[in-house]
Each structure stands twice: as C-alpha cells, then as structure tokens.
C-alpha cells in the first residue's frame, strides 16, 4: 500500500508554523508496517493545489491531505478536490446542523463563511469532527483515495485515529508486529553496529529495522510482517534488550521523566534537587508529569556560591579548594538537597554551560552530576558539546537517567 502526505498552507512554507502532523502520522503508520513514500508541502494556491492532488493521487493508494478546510478565503481544499474530480460542491445538511449547534453553544449565529466548512465534493464521504468545527472528507481520486483533514493538530490526530488508521489497518488485513526500545546517550552509529547480528540473522529476513536519534535518546525500531509476526517481534525484543542492557531506559511510548516519577512512586520515595547550571530544568521536567507532587520534595536553584553555602550547606572550604564546578561540589549539592528536603534521594548538578566561563582545565560543557541515596552518593563528570541551551538540557536529562539507574 503506497501512502503519501500532502500538507497545505502558506504558513508551512513561510516558516510561521512547523508541521507536526506529518511526523506524527508517519510514526503511527510505521507501527502498521508502512513507510510514507513522499510528503509534499504546497501553498494556498489553486493551481498548485490541483496539480499536487493530481500528482499524488496518480502514485499513491492513499493520500492524506491536511489544511484548507476552514471558513476563510484561502481555505481551498474542498474546491480543488472537486475541480480535480470534475464534480460540483454540495451542501451537507447534517454538518450544517452540527455547526449551528456548535455556534449556538457559544452564543453566536452561524455566518455564511462558516457554512463553507459543510460543502464537499459530490460523492464524498464526510468524516465528522468531534474536536473542532471543520469535518473531514474522503473520496476516490486517481488510483486510490484522498482523505482531507483539518490541519489543527488535535483535530487532525483525532480524525486519523478514528478514520485513517482503522481504514489502513482494514486494507492491510493482518497488521505487522512492531517493537521500539529507547536508548540513553547511545550514538545512532553505535546502535546500528551493535544491532548487526540481529539484522543479519536469516531468521529476521523481511524485518524492517530503523533508527532515530534525538539526543540524548536513540530509538531502535523493528516491524515484522507475515504469519507469526508477534512471536518473531518478541524474540527480537529479547535480543535487543540483551545487547543494550541498562542503556535501554524505555520502550514504546515511555518517556524518561514519566519513568522516573513512576519508579519513585512505586517505591514510595521522594527526591530533592540541588541545581546550578541547569537552572531548574530537572524540576521542570519532573513537574510536567502528572503525579509529580507525590515524589518531588523540593527543587533549589543554587546559582551563586553563597546560595550553595547558605541554602544547601555546601562547605565554603570545598568551594575554595575545588571550585563550584567540581565533583565534590556536585556531591555536596546532592547530599545537601537530600538533607534539606528530608527526601530519600538527592540530585546535584553543577557545570559551565557557556558560551563563556570555560578554562583549559574546565572547558565550556564541563558538568558534574551526583545522586545521593540511602546507600551513598554516586557522581559522574561529563563533557558536553553544543550551545548553552543544549548543554543545560543534556545535563538535565543525564541527571534523570542517573536517578533512573539508581532506582533500579
């Protein structure tokens, strides 16, 4: 089955808006064993839209088109699909009634331009939209079918889940089995090299392997087609987990902050944070997780040396002897946070995020991290590359990963 994506809108081509819909759908289709063959971006121009619809539907069995479904002058999708088919637009009364009721709830009358959202090419199947005002629609075009959806992400994704993905699954019949593991701080090339014995195994003929690097994560993914796919995918999973061991921090939809919160909650324990160069990023990552209040005791941004001494009890002589960016100070920050918060765990981070402040002995990107727990304190040193934001974010995620490992 050949699938293409056609994303429309001037805003996507001027850089005002980043298309997040297409990567999301590509990932969901990959779970079904399908790789999108092409993605096309096209402006709100009638000639360009008609040409793009003709081109994509001549190649693909399914074209998922987004944008241009609203009430304004530059919303042209229904009009252009109808022009390609050589059919008129027709008013869809059930959609008109839904729009009237929606506007009534907001105390407004339905205006003529909003009625535009309920006009579709003759013969189209209308896809109701529970998340917004503009329905989607689908109609046969060319060698296959085009599905036209609003571009608002929550609406696009909802309609994909309700119509596009079930339609694709029904066309495919037996859905392939897929697996995904997430590695922490493993370069993509290293992951590929380590996976060679699995990929070259004749038992895995026909399996599609893929990698995605999004520092500090690298994702290893596999899709297994055909009979016995689930059992084959499970065997691959066991081999992958054996290869990477503790470098695997999660699978599927797992996210590192959520895993850390879940592990702390399962143990009935809390953590306290003593951050310097990260400026509260670790606390931000944790508090973004629902339920974090049950496991996060306190977060201190002790940026100045005086604050390190006064708030977290870092000894002045330690700072004088080793400097703020050092392993002893990272340990003292972790232990001070743990002590101050009365928590089971403490995390300490200190470093030079740049762009200035580095020395030959401690260049920009030098970061010391520590985790203090019931059995003592573990510390690591890292030399990160990148700009100030990248260094700080790497350090924040590294701190969470160290805590994850300590909680195993």
Swiss-Prot record:
Alphabetized SUPFAM superfamilies for the sequence? CinA-like (SSF142433), Molybdenum cofactor biosynthesis proteins (SSF53218)
Pfam families to which the protein is assigned, alphabetical? CinA, MoCF_biosynth
| InterPro entries, per database record | CinA, CinA-like_C, CinA_C, Competence-induced_CinA, MoaB/Mog-like_dom_sf, MoaB/Mog_dom
Q: Please state which protein family the record places this protein in.
A: Belongs to the CinA family.
The protein, known as: CinA-like protein
Q: What is the lineage of its organism?
A: Bacteria, Pseudomonadati, Myxococcota, Myxococcia, Myxococcales
């Amino acid at each position: 089955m050949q699938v293409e994506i056609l994303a429309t809108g001037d805003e996507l081509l001027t850089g005002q808006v980043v298309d997040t819909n297409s990567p999301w759908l590509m990932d969901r289709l990959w779970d079904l064993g399908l790789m999108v063959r092409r993605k096309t971006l096209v402006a709100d121009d009638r000639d360009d839209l008609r040409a793009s619809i003709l081109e994509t539907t001549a190649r693909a069995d399914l074209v998922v088109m987004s944008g241009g479904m609203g009430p304004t002058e530059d919303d042209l999708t229904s009009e252009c699909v109808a022009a390609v088919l050589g059919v008129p637009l027709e008013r869809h009364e059930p959609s008109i009634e839904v729009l009237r009721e929606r506007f009534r709830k907001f105390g407004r009358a339905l205006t003529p331009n909003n009625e535009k959202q309920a006009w579709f090419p003759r013969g189209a199947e209308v896809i109701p939209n529970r998340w917004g005002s503009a329905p989607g629609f689908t109609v046969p075009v060319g060698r296959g079918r085009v599905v036209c959806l609003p571009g608002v992400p929550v609406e696009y994704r909802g309609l994909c889940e309700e119509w596009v993905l079930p339609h694709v699954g029904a066309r495919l019949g037996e859905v392939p089995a897929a697996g995904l593991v997430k590695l922490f701080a493993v370069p993509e090339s290293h992951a590929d090299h380590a996976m060679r014995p699995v990929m070259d195994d004749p038992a895995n003929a026909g399996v599609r392997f893929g990698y995605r690097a999004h520092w500090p994560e690298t994702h290893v993914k596999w899709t297994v087609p055909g009979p016995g796919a689930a059992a084959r995918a499970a065997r691959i999973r066991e081999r992958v987990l054996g290869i990477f061991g503790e470098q695997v921090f999660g699978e599927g939809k797992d996210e590192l902050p959520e895993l850390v919160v879940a592990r702390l909650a399962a143990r009935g324990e809390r953590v306290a944070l003593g951050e310097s160069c990260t400026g509260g990023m670790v606390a931000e990552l944790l508090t973004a997780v629902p339920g974090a209040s049950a496991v996060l005791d306190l977060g201190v941004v002790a940026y100045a040396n005086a604050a390190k001494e006064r708030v977290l009890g870092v000894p002045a002589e330690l700072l004088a002897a080793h400097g703020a960016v050092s392993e002893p100070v990272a340990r003292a920050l972790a232990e001070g946070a743990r002590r101050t918060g009365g928590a089971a765990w403490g995390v300490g981070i200190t470093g030079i995020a740049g762009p200035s402040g580095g020395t030959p002995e401690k260049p920009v990107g030098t970061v010391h991290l520590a985790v203090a727990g019931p059995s003592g304190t573990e510390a690591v040193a890292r030399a990160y590359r990148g700009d100030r934001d990248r260094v700080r974010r790497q350090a924040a995620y590294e701190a969470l990963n160290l805590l994850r490992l300590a909680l195993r």
